From Swiss-Prot:
Textual note on the cofactor: Binds 2 [4Fe-4S] clusters. One cluster is coordinated with 3 cysteines and an exchangeable S-adenosyl-L-methionine.
Sites where the protein binds [4Fe-4S] cluster 1: 28, 64, 98
GO CC terms in record: cytosol
Protein name in UniProt: tRNA-2-methylthio-N(6)-dimethylallyladenosine synthase
Upper classification of the organism: Bacteria, Bacillati, Actinomycetota, Actinomycetes, Mycobacteriales
Domain spans labelled MTTase N-terminal: 19-135
UniProt KW Ligase keyword: no
Gene name tied to this protein: miaB
Length: 510
């Protein structure tokens, strides 16, 4: 573990209950969920979440290291806080997450006004590090080299009353040449199925309707259990999906991300046969060129990928399939790029997260010859975007006239106030902006509505025909009351002492 670094930091500690915090999150769903844990830790230590638009006494950056612009964004935001830190020495700044794990030796050099640097393996140390930095007037840098405590054993202050992330594993055993995540998050460690289901049950007991199972590679779940007494089980993920289907009150189950190399038919069968598993699949492709996939060490080829898509659609005809794509991987030729366009055209993705290759120091791909010129990458990227936008619009236009069930959400529609619409997600994950009509004041985030699609755009659907059904839910009650679920149910790694009691359920029956 990296030890303390001497650096002038904050002054004596004011009363914790009077101090506020803000967590700023960059990156993937794993980071979003980790930020919920960071918030839970700080609230458990006596700090209060800062109000909207207020200057917080403690600002925590939970960082991403996947792309170069994440570095630039972090240090730009840190520089914006420097004048405030200078005028208010009691303010504290903490940097955690993947970028902190990677840049442990340089964060303070680039931003010496930072008080705490912590990594991906020791997020539970944040309150103690803040106290130590404030008491000793010494900035704290503490980076663990291996997981100290399974993160889900930590308290989590959830962002939503109706939808929740549930980690089934941390880390990754794959060796994709473009990805730095395994080096920063470590080897895969899986939670026991019973512990995952206990957390899901706790969330449902508090009114949550939708959970998303999280892992870097959910298809590998079951081969690296944290508990050495738990037998390896390559069919564990399909069994976990089916077990979620037996939890009364859990209406929607999603998962991310699977890996094409290990995606098996038992998972497809579980998806098709478990009613609350949503008809959606996010399956990263990255490239349609077998030559580039080999250079990426992706362990599958385009034919296998397309075969999975065909089998999913045969079992779940209306499944919405999304993907990740990288343009401009080192050595990519026009022929390779055309192969990607061909697979995208054949796959008919409802949407895609498309990225220009970003060279990351510490990854094998960064050392490869034939780095593609930026102008070439940009031109190819635009062609891919144009193709996928056309496909997305065609796929969404095909939804017009269909009846959809929506879980009403908050923060999904930037123009909702101007258009008098609300927003929600269909069971297949599509974003729908809908007109609530005369009952609009009665519809709350967390409620469930049924409406008919009347219009389409590449990234969303419109439903202006009014509501067919509106069901008030406990999640909607909780949102209206400003209540959010909390978890921290002991999970998958040995712990000391008895777990805290589960929170009492609130709200009326659904």
């Amino acid at each position: 573990m990296t030890s303390t670094v001497t650096q002038q930091a904050s002054g004596p500690s004011p009363d914790r209950s009077a101090r506020t915090f803000e967590v700023r999150t960059y990156g993937c769903q794993m980071n979003v969920h980790d930020s919920e844990r960071l918030a839970g830790l700080l609230e458990g230590a006596g700090y209060r979440r800062a109000g909207e638009g207020a200057d917080a006494d403690i600002v925590v950056f939970n960082t991403c290291a996947v792309r170069e612009n994440a570095d630039n964004k972090l240090y730009g935001n840190l520089s914006h806080l420097a004048p405030r830190k200078q005028s208010d020495p009691d303010m504290q700044i903490a940097v955690g997450g993947c970028l902190a794990q990677k840049d442990r030796d340089s964060v303070l050099r680039k931003a010496p006004w930072v008080d705490v640097v912590f990594g991906t393996h020791n997020i539970g140390s944040l309150p103690a590090l803040l106290d130590r930095a404030r008491h000793n007037r010494v900035a704290q840098v503490e980076i663990a080299e291996a997981l100290q405590e399974f993160p889900s054993a930590l308290p989590a202050s959830r962002e939503s009353s109706y939808a929740a992330w549930v980690s089934i594993s941390v880390g990754c055993n794959n060796t994709c040449t473009f990805c730095i995540v395994p080096a920063l998050r470590g080897r895969e460690v899986d939670r026991r199925p019973g512990d995952v289901l206990a957390e899901v049950q706790s969330l449902v007991d508090q009114g949550v309707l939708e959970i998303t199972l999280l892992g870097q590679n959910v298809n590998a779940y079951g081969v690296s259990f944290a508990d050495p007494t738990e037998p390896r089980d390559r069919g564990a993920f399909a069994k976990l999906l089916r077990a979620c289907g037996r939890i009364d009150g859990l209406e929607r189950v999603r998962f991310t991300s699977p890996h094409p190399a290990e995606f098996t038919d038992d998972v497809i069968e579980a998806m098709a046969e478990t009613p609350n598993v949503c008809p959606t699949l996010h399956m990263p492709l990255q490239s349609g060129s077998d030559r580039i996939l080999r250079a990426m060490r992706r362990s599958y080829r385009a034919e296998r990928y397309l075969g999975i898509i065909d089998r999913v659609r045969a079992a779940i005809p209306h499944a919405a399939i999304t993907t990740d794509l990288i343009v401009g991987f080192p050595g990519e030729t026009e022929e390779d790029f055309q192969a990607t366009l061909d697979v995208v055209a054949a796959s008919r993705f409802s949407s895609a997260f498309t990225f220009q290759y970003s060279k990351r120091p510490g990854t094998p791909a960064a050392e490869l010859a034939d780095q593609v010129p930026k102008a070439v990458v940009s031109e190819r990227y635009q062609r891919l975007i144009e193709l996928q936008e056309r496909i997305s619009l065609e796929e969404n236009t095909a939804q017009i006239g269909r009846r959809v069930e929506l879980l009403v959400a908050t923060g999904e529609g930037r123009k909702d106030a101007a258009t008098a619409r609300m927003s929600g997600r269909a069971r297949d994950g599509r974003l729908v902006h809908f007109a609530p009509g005369a009952v609009g004041s009665e519809v709350r985030p967390g409620d469930v509505v049924v409406t008919t699609v009347t219009g389409a755009a590449p990234h969303h659907l419109i439903a202006d025909a009014g509501l067919i059904e509106h069901r008030r839910t406990r999640a909607g009650d909780a949102h209206a009351a400003g209540q959010k679920p909390r978890t921290g149910v002991g999970l998958g790694m040995p712990a000391v002492g008895a777990p805290d009691p589960l929170p009492a359920t609130t709200g009326c029956a659904r």
